[in-house]
Curated annotation (Swiss-Prot):
CDD domains linked to this entry: GRX_GRXh_1_2_like
Lineage, opening ranks: Eukaryota, Fungi, Dikarya, Ascomycota, Taphrinomycotina
Keywords, sorted A to Z: 2Fe-2S, Iron, Iron-sulfur, Metal-binding, Nucleus, Redox-active center
Domain Glutaredoxin: 56-159
GO biological process: cellular response to oxidative stress
Gene Ontology CC entries for this record: cis-Golgi network; cytoplasm; endoplasmic reticulum; fungal-type vacuole; Golgi apparatus; Golgi lumen; nuclear outer membrane-endoplasmic reticulum membrane network; nuclear periphery
Keyword Cell division in record: no
InterPro entries documented for this protein: Glutaredoxin, Glutaredoxin_euk/vir, Glutaredoxin_subgr, Thioredoxin-like_sf
Gene, per the UniProt record: grx3
Name recorded for this polypeptide: Monothiol glutaredoxin-3
Function field: Monothiol glutaredoxin involved in the biogenesis of iron-sulfur clusters. Binds one iron-sulfur cluster per dimer. The iron-sulfur cluster is bound between subunits, and is complexed by a bound glutathione and a cysteine residue from each subunit.
Complex and partners: Homodimer.
Species name: Schizosaccharomyces pombe (strain 972 / ATCC 24843) (Fission yeast)
Keyword Iron: yes
Sequence similarity: Belongs to the glutaredoxin family. Monothiol subfamily.
Length: 166
């Protein structure tokens, strides 16, 4: 019984420390007087793109505001297949957001950042509820195995639905 209490207290302390580190520790020192928008892009260049974390912050709001995000590379057949499945074949509510990584001035930094938080360095990199579920092959397999809705439910806490198509 005493070992269980020690384990629970230790687990709680470690969890609180990790939350503190995640929320309050910037990846880099902020730039002084930075005027560029997220990832060095002016805010008016890509009006339909979601707000992405600045290269000098731990701002993960993009994942809170957009439960399904497809980080994509134009011209990539795997990116095209994932976008087609999640934006045309299926009707998601809310709809998936497509982020073309080459639209950003700091493309390589964005790709490195995505790789660091997901251990996936290829495109597309599909995030559901802030968690990478892999690329085109992974999402296609979930769809074919009829596990996509349960994955969406699990990672978004039932906030994304696959609606019937017309």
């Amino acid at each position: 019984m005493a070992n269980r209490k020690i384990f629970l207290i230790t687990s709680l302390i470690i969890s609180l420390l990790l939350i503190h580190i995640f929320i309050f520790s910037p990846l880099n020192e902020p730039e002084k007087n930075a005027k560029a928008g997220p990832l060095g892009l002016s805010d008016v260049s890509v009006p339909s793109a979601p707000k992405l974390p600045a290269k000098d912050s731990t701002d993960f709001e993009v994942f809170l505001e957009n439960p399904v995000i497809i980080f994509s590379r134009p011209g990539c057949p795997y990116s095209a297949a994932a976008k087609k499945l999640l934006t045309e074949t299926l009707r998601l509510d809310p709809p998936a957001v497509v982020v073309e990584v080459t639209d950003y001035e700091h493309t390589q930094e964005l790709r490195d950042w995505l790789s660091s938080i997901s251990d996936i360095s290829t495109m597309p990199n599909i995030f559901v509820g802030g968690h990478s579920i892999g690329g085109s092959d992974s999402v296609r397999a979930l769809y074919q195995e009829e596990k996509l809705q349960s994955t969406l439910d699990e990672w978004t806490h039932n906030k994304v639905l696959i609606l019937p198509t017309d």
